[in-house]
Every structure is written in C-alpha cells, then in structure tokens.
Amino acid sequence: MKAYKPPVVNKFGVISSTYHEELLKSIFESSNRRKSQKPKPSFSISKEFILRFNHTDNPAEEEELLEQARRLIVRSKRKLGLKTLGSGKHVHLPTAWAEVIYLAQCKGEIQDEALNMLHASLDHVSFDHDQLPALFFLAESVLYRLCCDAFMKGYLYSVEIKLVKIGYLIFLRLFVFFLHGHLESFKQHLLRLQPYLYALHFSEPSYYKYPNIISNVQFILKTSEIICKRELHSEPFVESPDETEDPYSDLNHLQLNKRGYEVNHLLWHSVAAWSCVQNNRPQLTEVLEHLLFYKTQLQTKCWLDSALALMVLGEAAKLDMACLKTLMDLVTDFLENILSAQNQEENYNIYDTSWASEIVFTYTTIIAEVCLYAATSDLRKTALIGFCACKSPQQGISLTDKSEELPELDGASILTLLKYFSSRISDNCEKVIWIGYYGIVYNLVKMSWELQGEQDQDGLRNMIWQTLQKIKDYEQDPRIRCALVIAQAELNGPSDPFCTKATPNSGEEVFSKYIGWRIATTLSRLFFPSLDVAPPKTPVEVDLPRKHTIRERQPAKKRVLRFILKDHSSVVEVSMTPYPNFFTKADKKLEEIIDHHWQKDMEARKREEEAYKAQNQKDKEEKEKIHFQEIMKQRERKLNKQTKPYEIILSEKESGSEKKCGFFELKPSTAPNAK
C-alpha cells in the first residue's frame, strides 16, 4: 500500500532550520507577552483598589475611584437580590457577600452602603447549607474588624454598631444550621474563629453601658460556646483561672453528644403555634395552652432557646391575636417571677441578671416589630397599649409622678412596660429594670424613625412622638438619656473611626424584618416535615448508608413531644407554606391589572350600548316626524287645507277683540270660505 505524504509548505521561504526555530520561539513569546499584559477589568475589587481609594489625595482620581466603587455597589446589589428577597437567576450570594465585605473596607459612604446591604441581605435571604463557607468567611471578617479596629477606639461609633448587628445575624444563622446538623464538616472554620471570640469575650465589659450592643455580643458568645462544645467536643474556649465557678456552667446539663442538640419544649411549641397559624389549623388553642404550661422554661439560664422561642412566637403574634396574648402573658409571668426572686435575694448571683436582662431586651425588640409590622391595626394597637379598655392611652403614662404607690405589672405592651419600668428606675435598681426601660426607649426612637412618611399611621407615630417628648422632658436618669442619644446616632449616622467623611444613609433597615420569618419557616420544616419529604410508613429499601438514616431519625425522636404526634398526627402532615414571595405578589398584581382592564372594557361596552339606544331613539323620532309630514301633505292635497286636523280657525270679530286685548295677531286663514 502506498504511503500518502502531504506536501510541505514553507511559509517562511528558504531559511535555515536554526533560524526557523528562533523565529517560532520569538512568535510564541510575543503571543504570551500580549496575554500577560492584558489589563484587569475595571470592575474587579483588589487590595490595590482599596488602598488607592482610602489614601488618594488627587481630587480627580478620588472622583474616578468613587464612581467605580458606586458601579461595584450597583453590581453587588443585583447579585444580592435585595429587591427579590435573595431569589432569582442573577443572585449569587457567596460571591456577592465576599465583594460587599471587601467594599466595606473603603471609607465614607461606600462603607456605610456596603454594611447596610450586607445587613439587609443577611436579614431576608433563605437558609441554604451551601452558604456556610461564605458565612464563616463573613464571621471571621466581622470579628477581625471588631477586635482589631473597633476595640482600639475610645468611643462608640455607628460602624461598630452595624458590625455587631451583622455579627448577630451571622451567628443566628450558624445556630440554625447547627440545629440541622450541617456544621460537622466545618471544625477547621470553628477553630479559626476561637481567637477572635476570645478577644470579644474580654472586650465585653466595655459594652455594659449599651444594652443594645451587649445583647448582640452575648448572643454571639453564647452561640459560639454551644456550637464549639458540641462540634469540637472540647471545653469552652473561655476559661477564667481566677474564678472557681465557670460562668457557663449552665451548659453542663445539656446533652451535647453525638446524638445532637436537644431543644426545649418552649421552642418546640412556639414553632408548632406558628405552623398552626400559617396553615389555619384548629389545634392552635391547644398548642398555646401547652406552651403556657412550659412557661417556666423561660426562666432557665440557658436562654438561647428561649430567645428563639420568643422570636418565633413574635412572628405568629403578627398574624394572630391569641398568639400575641400568649406572648404577653409569658413575659408578664417571667418579669413577676424574676423580680420577686431578686427582691428576696436568695440564690442570686451576677449571672442571673445577665440572662434575664437578655430575655427582656429581646422581647422589647420583638414587641416593637409586632407594633410596626403586624397584619391588622388591632394587633398593632394591642402591642402598643395592651388589652385595656381605656379611651386615651396617654392618660395612663406619667413619668413625673414617682410616688410611693408603684403600679403593678398588668401586661407586657409597650406603654404598660414603659409605665412600669419608669416608676421603678433608680440608681440602685435591678439590672432588669433599667435595661428593660432602655430597650423600650431605644425601640421607640427607632419606631418613630421607621414611621416617617407613613400617612396611614400618623396616629401611631404621633403617640410615639408624644411619649418620647415626655421622656426627654422629665427623665433625668443618664442611662435612659443615653438610649435616646445612641438610637438617634445609629439612625443619623455620625462620623466613625474608619472613614474621614460619613453621610447619613436613609436606606438603612432599622429592624430585622424577615429573619424571624425565615427562622420560623426553617424550624417548622425541621420539626414538622411535610408528607413529600417525610419517610414512608411502610418500610422501603433505600440505597443510603445506615448511619445516615439513623442520624436523620434520631434527633426527630428527641425533639418530638407526645401531645402533638400522638393525639394530633395531622400536624405532621401539614405543608409549610411561607409568606407570599416575590412571584406570588407579582401574580396577584397581574390579576389586579387584568381585573382593572376588564372593568374598563365593561364600562366601554356600557357606553356603547347607551349610545346605540340613543341613536335608535333619535331614528325613531325622525321616522315619526317624516310620517307626520307625509300625512299633512296628503291632507293638503285632498282638502286644500294647510291646518292640522281639528285646528280651530278664528273669525275676524274674534280676531279684532283679541288684538284689543293685547294678544298676538294671528295670520288670516287661507281657506276660501273664511270671512
């Protein structure tokens, strides 16, 4: 068989082999050189960009970098999905979170905008275990900023408050993932967080004057303590060699072993109540009765589950009056028992006030959110003034008269707690009293700011404004006046140590509007799986390892309470439907638009029918007129008369007398026989 040899084409002419190799080598190097010298895209965030942005002195370059940073902010907003609650094909949260935390290192308005975007995103996005690496990166970045930048300053700044609020949302999400058992493969990430948590623990006393910050800091430390003790199987990262008693000894009774973390009954029943409200289940009354039966669990020093229970029950209270009453009854009973125990001074130590004040401050935030975002006006009014029948709620508030007859605690509404705490505030009062008073005043300022521009709620805003004016005029306690200053500074955005210029940002989210709903939805799916995800009743062989099957079923056996699963098995079978999302609202809006156009079409048809009837009437009258004219023509032709039938013709005498009387003159008849 002949071998085919293609012809050799020499593109370089007749040259030597050595020169040919050198020519090919130079062409290859030049092509690689052009690729390596390709500039980076202008939209990339790098260390050089941040350094140039923060240290440039050239006004032209500063304006150019600021414009580029604004374009980066717009791109990050789209990736975060701030307008769609973190959903959509264009959303990529891990990348967007990393970009935003990098942009937060820039000075001025870019830093404020980036932190506000990150806080809003962490508030409203749904829970997905693919977010865990990015969440740990955010946690490490925020803790680093707090420990290495914020703690070095001698004053409190708005950026520091925002960082603490963002850290609270991050660790709240990590704790929910911990309840699902998703943190088992992130031990290395937890170890990297421990030095920063250790520094945060020792800087905690610097925040004791600010309950709004110390509340978030204590939540971060408590959450990390439980997660690290469970996942790392070691002692707590905080140890006090000078003290014989462990400040976190209340964790020793928890069953933090391989079988998982056991939630208390209060949290379980709160999630059950929320599920009943969401699905309109008739078992709501019985669930609330059982929830009140476990109200003593709110008084345990392991308060993390209690805080989550109040948060979930607060979400149910935004939709149902019975849940709101149960929430108020829980807190009223809690305050009465805690204050009576402190007055007796039995078994009282420094850690009791810490966890009790944490519960009280958490409740003040929850009841403020209910007052703002409840579904009906009755719920909002009840959250503000309680279940009283008084006509004017302002009559019940008196901040000037602190007489010996102190009012009793008859509810847990905002104004009721304000009246109760203000009558008992003093220099040596219990920590729960002044922190509760601080929380009420702090949230009232934020509520007044949130209601700006809401014309439908002018009455609520006026009542809050009048209450704040009374507090400003008559309250002399420096801790309460500090609450007014801190809240106003947080909303107005003063200067901070991380930037040379700061502008107030009106787009900042004052309250975390969605995180409670997200947590309630996720926990309801964990505690009460729907039929499509629940394992079948008949044994079916599944190609999964046995260890994985046991790990899924064992926590459910520990968390399940008998009264629901045994007596009311239908609770497990309900499908958990979340609040209307963006697409549901869009469909509803489209339906309204279609209905509007249908109404316009009906009105147009009605106008056409009326015009058609009017035209028919006009044509009918025209036909009658033509018919009458034809009759008159026939009469004139036959009788030679132009008078109408039965028309009377006057004689000349009668016509003359009528002229004398002043009547109009009539034309003489044209009939031939007329005289």
Swiss-Prot record:
BP GO terms, sorted: cell projection organization; flagellated sperm motility; maintenance of protein complex location; spermatid cytoplasm removal during spermiation of flagellated sperm; spermatogenesis
Disruption outcome: Deficient mice are viable and display no apparent abnormalities. However male mice are infertile. Mice display an abnormal sperm flagellum morphology. Furthermore, mice have low sperm motility and decreased total sperm count. The sperm flagella of deficient mice have abnormalities in the cytoplasm removal and the flagella axoneme lacks microtubule doublet 7 and the corresponding ODF.
Gene Ontology CC entries for this record: membrane; outer dense fiber
Compartment(s) of residence: Membrane
Main location: membrane
Keyword Amino-acid biosynthesis attributed: no
Protein's membrane topology: Single-pass membrane protein
Chain segments annotated as transmembrane: 163-183
Function according to Swiss-Prot or TrEMBL: Plays a critical role for male fertility and sperm motility by regulating sperm cytoplasm removal and maintaining axoneme integrity.
Protein name: Transmembrane protein 232
